[in-house]
Amino acid sequence: MKALLVLGLLAAVGYFVFHNGEDLDWRSLSASLTAPVQRIARHDSSDGLIHTGAACPPSHASGDAAVQFSTSPDGQAEALVLSVIDGAHTELDVAAYELTNARIAEHLIARARAGVQVRVVLDRSQLDGRASKLSRLAAAGIPVRIDLAVPLMHDKLIVADGDTTQTGSMNYTQAGAHRNAENVLVVWHHPELATAARAAWTRLWEESQPWTPG
């Protein structure tokens, strides 16, 4: 039950942030939080709605929303991020304070080579070259922008195929995945949340500057 309360609070905070606290549809928010809790109360974990520590997308009927939550430093959080990337078919919009994790960068490049539209916004700290995968992504043809409009762009966000959202505390780094105590939350197949997350990502993309080598 504590886990449900935590997820409910995370969802409420996310909803508030993505909507900038304005014109909130509280009835829709209440329904979106209540329905999953009611379904969990009626079913055990085999229902496929809430999963913890799993590295692969949950098994559920196409179009059904599901939530996964994983932590580091045991590698499960990184595996969950990779499952979101690998599961994308059309587009991946990424906003990252840091992107120095070689596995995550290579999986993004692999999806781009498979025809998925991949776009990445990074914080200005990635310009210093220390383990940044900025050049590697750009060399693979992935559009990369640097956010110079704010002092710190601290997001860790991926929106996949316009219906799946990944966020959490974990930076896309080796330390975040394998040394620090971090968390990753994924909401699969929830277009309304993904639309709000995509709008937040788009604001970052539009305020950022395209990066080119040299």
Where are these regions (language model features)?
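Short, small/polar-rich loop/turn modules that mediate ligand/substrate recognition or access, typified
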Residues: 2-71, 75, 79, 202-214
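General small-molecule cofactor/ligand-binding pocket signal
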Residues: 70, 121, 145-147
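Primarily the HKD phosphodiesterase
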Residues: 81-143
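Short, structured motif recognition centered on aromatic/hydrophobic residues
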Residues: 85, 97, 157, 197, ...
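Solvent-exposed loop/turn segments at secondary-structure junctions
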Residues: 98-102, 124-128, 150-153, 164-165, ...
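Short, solvent-exposed loop/turn segments at the edges of secondary structure
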Residues: 139, 152-153, 160, 179-180
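Short beta-strand scaffold segments in enzyme catalytic cores
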Residues: 156-159, 185
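Signature of lipid phosphatidyltransferase scaffolds
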Residues: 165-214
